[in-house]
């Protein structure tokens, strides 16, 4: 075999070695390198989510405030957030007012919670040494002023329902005395009246219904939530000379003698 041919055959494997090494796969990226490469993509997605949420929030807040969206088409992000905060504060104030009107104990719970938080702040400021004395004094004074304002708040006024006395065994309804309905020289005895509704329409007088009685007198009707709406009516006669009315089903001869125990009197 010629010598030059042997050199060509011997050199061919060595020449093919660099080509085979160039086809080897790259090393896997580390976690830090992967985060660096995906950070721009994640930032782009985050901004897209923020912009989409702000767009929906803008539509909702403009609808809630009854404002024309065409006039507020170029609202800044800060304006949208400020309008949302103000709207939520107004809603919270309305809900607090409604809760106080329906459940007066809410105000007591609020006072107790505020007092507890104030005590915790006072305890922290008294034990912390890094707080400036002026700042501590102003903060405690502000909290004390707020506490005084909360304590000065009154419960919402609700219509007072006259208290009912103990029911007499012979009657199905308790005897009620009306206080402050109309000036009169003597206390007005109250009788339970069993029967249908009054013939003429009732008139509202001082929060009570003024209904003419069949005997020509006038009666103030007191609604009692403890009894059904279509049940018996408890009239309070303005004339103290009107006697105690008996139910139609009970005759005076069968009825036992009614003494002063059946009618409440202050004497």
UniProtKB/Swiss-Prot annotation:
Biased composition (Polar residues): 8-25
Biased composition (Basic and acidic residues): 26-35
InterPro entries, sorted: bHLH_dom, HES_HEY, HLH_DNA-bd_sf, Orange_dom
SUPFAM superfamilies for this protein: HLH, helix-loop-helix DNA-binding domain, Orange domain-like
Localization annotation: Nucleus
Nucleus found in the keyword field: yes
Record-level GO BP terms: negative regulation of DNA-templated transcription; negative regulation of muscle organ development; negative regulation of transcription by RNA polymerase II; Notch signaling pathway
Keyword field contains Nucleotidyltransferase: no
Residue window of motif WRPW motif: 264-267
Gene Ontology CC annotations of this record: nucleus
Keyword field: Developmental protein, DNA-binding, Notch signaling pathway, Nucleus, Repressor, Transcription, Transcription regulation
Domain notes: Has a particular type of basic domain (presence of a helix-interrupting proline) that binds to the N-box (CACNAG), rather than the canonical E-box (CANNTG).
Function: Transcriptional repressor of a subset of early mesodermal genes including myod1 and t/bra. Binds DNA on N-box motifs: 5'-CACNAG-3'. Acts as a negative regulator of myogenesis, mediating Notch signaling to repress expression of myod1.
UniProt protein name: Transcription factor HES-1
Organism: Xenopus tropicalis
